[in-house]
Amino acid sequence: MKRIGLILMAVFLTLACAACGQEKGTEKMKPATKTASASALTEGKGDHKALVVYFSASGNTAKLAKTMAETLQADLLELQPAEPYTSHDLDYNTAGTRATVEQRDESARPKIAGNIGDLKQYDTVYIGYPIWWSLAPRIVYTFVESVDLSGKKVIPFCTSGGSGMGSSGEALAAVSKGKGNWARGREFSPNASAAQIKEWADKL
């Protein structure tokens, strides 16, 4: 009788373990939620009178902006979109994708995540961006229109796939409504050296 009881218990445990394993095997993973990071300021080693602001989709402009901020001992501010761009959004070769639609719409102003804050302490503001369809991405327009650049020297810079800076800087200056003393910017390679950046900045 005792032996039969042990056999029944073993059978019960085996069935229980099998059921448990089946439940785990069919459990569906929840899709990851894509969230926006707030735009954040990184303080440089200088006197906090110069600020490098940038938007980067692929990382090229980010690399350049970080080298520039370190070289010029400037504070660094990355513009993060409230709605992050996906790979599909950035498919420039497909009509109807987000980036294509935004760039074709002169009134498009994508929201920036987080609070930009007050720029009063800065005398010089460098604004970096990739070139999209010969212009700065519309989120950079959002930034220019949402801050007070009065009395500041404003210097645009960019990375591109070969199209050059074009009139992208002038287009940004136009939406600033006369605020800021805009200098002519230039295109850089993402791998620009500190020496190249310093030589350029010293001539501004």
Question: What feature does the model see in each segment?
Answer:
Residues 1-4:
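Positively charged n-region of N-terminal signal peptides that target proteins for export
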Residues 6-13:
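Sec-dependent N-terminal signal peptides
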Residues 15-19:
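C-terminal motif of bacterial Sec signal peptides marking the signal peptidase cleavage site
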Residues 21-123, 127, 134-136, 178, ...:
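N-terminal beta1-alpha1-beta2 submodule of the flavodoxin-like/Rossmannoid cofactor-binding fold
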Residues 119-120, 145-151, 175-177:
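Short, conserved loop/helix-junction motifs that constitute active-site signature segments
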Residues 131-134, 149, 160-164:
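Short Gly/Pro-enriched loop/turn and capping motifs at secondary-structure junctions
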Residues 139-145:
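Typically the conserved alpha-helix immediately C-terminal to a functionally engaged Cys/Sec
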Residues 153-188:
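Short, glycine-/small-residue-rich phosphate/pyrophosphate-handling segment
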